[in-house]
């Protein structure tokens, strides 16, 4: 942002929080933009704290949007969410919130992977417990244990026989190698780019 040639703005590119950012960093960007442009524009970035013009629903907005996407897919394909199965790659803000909201609609999440490992339980993982654990451990599942869950190789996440593969990790995780493994009927895209050149 430290430039007189502003490439972001409320009517240009509006940054949002992503990997390794948070509300404080978004507030700093908005503050720096105000210093350079000479005016306070709350719409220059999303994800700011409430005290600096943030939105009450921002933390869960992307995850909730993915819930709506899955609901729409179910309606168009004459399926009920209750009883669907899902595997999730990535359990940061998007993955954890999205998984929690989707799970609460009756979807059984059997596999969750993050940078620390991949957990599997054919009877369904305890997403409520995983959500609480991750949010109290810096959005990390490192050290998480659960009765009935096993740690499986990370690549096995892609080959789970599930209805939905929820991609919420870093971009380009689906590629020629991993796409060949996918059995899911739907890839729910919660990351920035799943690897469009290969899909």
Task: Specify the residue positions occupied by each region the protein language model found.
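Short, small-residue-biased leader/transition segments that mark boundaries at the very start
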Residues: 1-3
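Short secondary-structure capping/junction motifs at helix and strand boundaries
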Residues: 5-17, 38-41
């Amino acid at each position: 942002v430290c430039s007189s040639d502003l490439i972001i703005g409320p009517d240009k590119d509006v940054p949002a929080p992503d990997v390794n950012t948070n509300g404080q960093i978004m507030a700093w960007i908005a503050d720096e933009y105000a210093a350079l442009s000479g005016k306070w524009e709350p719409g220059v970035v999303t994800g700011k704290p409430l005290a600096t013009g943030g939105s009450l629903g921002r933390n869960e907005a992307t995850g909730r949007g993915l819930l709506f996407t899955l609901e729409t897919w179910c309606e168009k394909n004459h399926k009920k969410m209750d009883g669907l199965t899902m595997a999730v790659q990535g359990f940061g803000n998007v993955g954890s919130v999205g998984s929690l909201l989707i799970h609460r609609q009756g979807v059984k999440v059997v596999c969750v992977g993050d940078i620390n490992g991949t957990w599997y339980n054919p009877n369904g993982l305890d997403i409520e417990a995983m959500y609480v654990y991750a949010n109290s451990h810096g959005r990390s599942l490192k050290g998480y244990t659960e009765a009935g869950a096993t740690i499986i190789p990370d690549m096995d996440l892609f080959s789970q026989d599930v209805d939905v593969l929820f991609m919420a990790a870093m971009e380009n995780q689906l590629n020629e190698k991993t796409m060949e493994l996918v059995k899911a009927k739907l890839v729910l895209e919660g990351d920035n780019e799943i690897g469009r050149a290969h899909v």
